[in-house]
């Protein structure tokens, strides 16, 4: 420690230094140290604080630093009434945010003399508890003992503060030598001496610093990822927290992703179509104009799904009688029309909105057993061994394809699709134009170029044989019995036959049969294809469902459980649903083959069904039932007054269309087309 002669100092300074040195060892034994002896506090003018009495610091305990005032040769420690002591002067320092944040260079001797109000503060569990006596200190296991700590403190206190700013710096530096508990205690002590307005300011600052806006402080991509795990109810609650969160959640991308995740809409093209007319969407389904149209679309779809699942909700119903006692063999519908084929040669087109019969297409000479349309082009296959192409708008038959020698039992339309990438990373699209695939009881499969119908065409293009038909692309031969089912995508055709085999055909290889999949013990009635996973499924009279890799021909799995003919399969995304003559349906995980649910409730063989990943609608004798796919449970009966069979059923997100039979007497029945609309009323 430097001597009194090292620097210019007063006699009182030297005296204070001697006093300090005398007590140094005793304080060090307690882990405390007295400040350096040469602490002469002066002002910027010639008036010195030592004129009233020299003052030095000493640390009395880990939680307390008091001042020692020396007057001539007399030293008085801890005098609470001494107006020159630092503790008293500091307590009278004006405590305002400006004073705290922007220290001035006001001399220490110019501190204001305004008394302050001592305010009791609550003591949270994380804060030190105020002791009963003012001088009681917090004891902690850590100690200031050690030459390094003592020397550091002496170095900090070697420069005397001459301004308010320097004093604040000194206190800040000294507080760094305290333990965490004692630092908390020091803050608590200072807050006790703080005015109410300043406490209010501190409260606001602390509250703001403790708030962490997770959504706003992370990259937008991370925010969207976080939101993707929330359901719509939680999102709506979060949106009410603040305007910033509302703006984030009101982003259309948030709700488009939610539409897909909740399987309300999974096709981007459908979402784009639905959002084409946002004004109409907002007008019909929202009362809040500031909500984005994607959120309103989610609301619309969610309300409609909930109506489906609510047994108390009664959909708008239209019943149409129009086929006598004939069997409806095939059915397809959209928002404008319902198209039915029956076993009496006719094809009927009804209005979906009103149920009115709009057109009857005549020309086939036998029952219609297969139909499918795309756009305005309808294709039908009949027991008369012909395929007909129709313009539905005009009702005109535009083409007749001949070549099959027996009933056309199944057909499919393959649209252009991306099937891979070339060497340059560009999409490979196949086919170039829509293809029509027809399967017949003559064992063969025909591949046709689908004609584009023209409203101005008023004649029928008829081709008597295979060789003079420019639309015929290939004849796929190989099955030895009736072709019962066809599923196609891109360049691949999967066919199931009564010969108990499944065949894989590659149109990029001139329609060559790449694999004959053998494994079933009886007739194959149904097929499904998942092109991207190179997987196909087949259902058979042997009661099994076989899962194949159509690229390698490998039998991957056999799904067992049904007790009779598996006549129907439907694959949507990763959900495979099977329906059998044992009166049950089963829901399978298409990737793993795991059985998710067994749907029991029908009293007879399942004659028709469809699913969309959320709902299954199934029909059997006298029953039309709705099931929840996710839960694997029965939801409701859609019709309760059917007295005969359910011939066909199809549905979209808002309507269910079924062809049903009502028994009039023992020998007579009547077929009806039932249209159930769950989108009415628009708002409820």
UniProtKB/Swiss-Prot annotation:
The keyword Cell cycle applies. WD repeats lie at residues 322-351, 363-391, 403-431, 442-468, 478-506, 519-549, 561-589. Residues 1-146 are annotated as: Disordered. Keywords: Cell cycle, Cell division, Mitosis, Repeat, Sporulation, WD repeat. Pfam families: CDC4_D, F-box-like, WD40. This is Cell division control protein 4. Coiled coil: none annotated. InterPro entries: Cdc4_D, F-box-like_dom_sf, F-box_dom, G-protein_beta_WD-40_rep, WD40/YVTN_repeat-like_dom_sf, WD40_repeat_CS, WD40_repeat_dom_sf, WD40_rpt. GO terms for biological process: cell division; sporulation resulting in formation of a cellular spore. Residues 212-258 form the F-box domain. GO terms for cellular component: nucleus; transferase complex. Residues 1-17, 64-77, 116-131 have a biased composition (Low complexity). This protein is essential for initiation of DNA replication and separation of the spindle pole bodies to form the poles of the mitotic spindle. It also plays a role in bud development, fusion of zygotic nuclei after conjugation and various aspects of sporulation. Required for HTA1-HTB1 locus transcription activation. Residues 18-29, 42-63, 78-88, 98-107 have a biased composition (Polar residues).
């Amino acid at each position: 420690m430097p001597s009194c002669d090292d620097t210019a100092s007063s006699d009182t300074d030297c005296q204070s230094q001697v006093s300090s040195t005398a007590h140094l060892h005793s304080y060090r034994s307690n882990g405390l140290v007295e400040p350096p002896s040469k602490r002469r506090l002066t002002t910027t003018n010639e008036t010195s604080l030592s004129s009233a009495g020299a003052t030095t610091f000493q640390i009395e305990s880990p939680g307390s630093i008091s001042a020692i005032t020396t007057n001539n040769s007399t030293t008085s420690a801890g005098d609470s009434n001494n107006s020159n002591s630092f503790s008293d002067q500091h307590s009278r320092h004006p405590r305002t945010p400006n004073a705290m944040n922007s220290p001035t260079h006001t001399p220490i001797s110019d501190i204001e003399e305004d008394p302050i109000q001592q305010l009791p503060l609550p003591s949270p569990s994380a804060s030190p508890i105020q002791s009963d006596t003012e001088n009681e200190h917090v004891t902690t296991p850590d100690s200031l003992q050690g030459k390094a700590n003592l020397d550091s403190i002496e170095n900090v206190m070697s420069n005397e503060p001459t301004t308010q700013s320097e004093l604040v710096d000194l206190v800040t530096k000294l507080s760094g030598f305290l333990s965490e508990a004692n630092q908390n205690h020091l803050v608590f002590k200072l807050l006790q001496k703080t005015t109410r307005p300043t406490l209010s300011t501190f409260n606001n600052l602390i509250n703001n610093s403790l708030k962490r806006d997770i959504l706003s402080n992370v990259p937008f991509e991370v925010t969207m990822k976080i939101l993707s795990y929330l359901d719509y109810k939680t999102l709506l609650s979060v949106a009410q927290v603040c305007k910033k969160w509302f703006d984030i959640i009101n982003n259309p991308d948030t709700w488009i992703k939610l539409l897909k995740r909740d399987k309300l809409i999974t096709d981007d093209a459908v979402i784009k179509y639905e959002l084409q007319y946002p004004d109409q969407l907002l007008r019909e389904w929202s009362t809040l104009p500031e909500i984005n149209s994607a959120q309103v679309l989610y609301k619309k779809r969610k309300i409609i799904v909930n109506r489906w699942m609510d047994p108390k909700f009664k959909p708008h119903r239209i019943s149409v009688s129009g086929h006598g006692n004939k069997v409806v063999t095939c059915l397809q519908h959209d928002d404008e029309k319902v198209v039915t084929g029956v076993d009496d040669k006719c094809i009927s087109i009804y209005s979906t909105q009103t149920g009115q019969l709009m057109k009857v297409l005549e020309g086939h000479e036998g029952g219609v057993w297969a139909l499918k349309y795309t756009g305005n082009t309808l294709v039908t296959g009949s027991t008369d061994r012909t395929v007909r192409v129709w313009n539905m708008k005009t009702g005109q038959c535009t083409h007749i394809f001949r070549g099959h020698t027996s009933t056309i039992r199944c057909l499919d339309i393959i649209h252009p699709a991306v099937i891979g990438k070339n060497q340059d990373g560009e999409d490979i699209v196949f086919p170039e134009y829509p293809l029509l695939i027809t399967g017949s009881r003559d064992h063969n499969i025909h591949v046709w170029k689908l004609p584009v119908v023209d409203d101005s065409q008023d004649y029928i293009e008829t081709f008597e044989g295979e060789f003079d038909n420019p639309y015929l692309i290939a004849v796929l031969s190989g099955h030895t019995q009736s072709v019962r089912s066809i599923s196609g995508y891109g360049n691949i055709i999967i066919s199931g036959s009564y010969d108990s085999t499944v065949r894989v055909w590659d149109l990029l290889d001139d329609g060559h049969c790449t694999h004959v999949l053998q494994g079933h013990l009886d007739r194959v009635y149904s097929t499904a294809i998942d092109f991207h996973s190179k997987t196909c499924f087949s259902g058979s009279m042997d009661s099994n469902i076989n899962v194949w890799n159509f690229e390698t021909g490998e039998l991957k799995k056999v799904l067992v459980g049904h007790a009779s003919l598996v006549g129907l399969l439907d694959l949507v995304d990763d959900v495979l649903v099977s329906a059998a003559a044992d009166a049950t349906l089963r829901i399978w995980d298409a990737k793993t083959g795991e059985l998710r649910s067994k749907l029991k409730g029908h009293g007879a063989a399942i004659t028709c069904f469809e699913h969309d990943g959320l709902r299954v609608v199934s029909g059997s004798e006298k029953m039309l039932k709705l099931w929840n796919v996710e839960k694997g449970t029965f939801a409701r009966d859609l019709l309760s007054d059917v007295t005969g069979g359910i011939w066909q059923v199809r549905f979209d997100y808002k309507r269910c269309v079924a062809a049903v039979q009502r028994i009039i007497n023992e020998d007579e029945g009547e077929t009806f087309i039932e249209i159930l609309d769950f989108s009415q009323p628009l708002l409820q």
